[in-house]
Amino acid sequence: MTKHTVDRAQLAVAIHESAHAVVGRVMGLTVRRAVIHEPDEHGHAGRCEFSRAPLGTPDVVDLAGTVAELRFEHGPRFSAYAVTDRLGVHRDDRRALVASGDPGTLDRTRRLIETTWSPIAELAATLYGFGEVSGEQVDAALKLSEYDDESTMQLSAIRAGTWPAARPIVPGGGELWRLHQS
């Protein structure tokens, strides 16, 4: 029997880049692709590419990779000090976060990571296995509709913390649908 081993450091990079992609998409950015590779001369082992964002990248997208990586390593409960320590390694993310000057960014990012943890983990598994994921794969992990108006509502529901956005509720066998929080 073949025993498969997992490189946890490379899987952490896949989680990191998947979180940038998923949270970026939730915040309205268009993901081109996310890739992981051997570390380059700057120590980067992956990247997430977005189409041009006229207003820039939201600060929660910059912090998402670090927060998801810590969530992967320590579970949902980790200290703000752990984030500060990790941002010492992820200097690009730290520079973007410091430039935003918003003290509420960490709380918003943690909530988004918890809300979208399943899609992040699913996308990270694909990224770890194949080394690259597309924007379409990000949308598939988020289970977004192919129709723009529906996907816009779904993304808004995710930002609001309701995941999934709607489920069928059939009291007495009727065909009623209503939005509810899960």
Question: Model-predicted segments: where are they?
Answer:
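Soluble catalytic regions of large protease machineries
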Residues: T2-S182
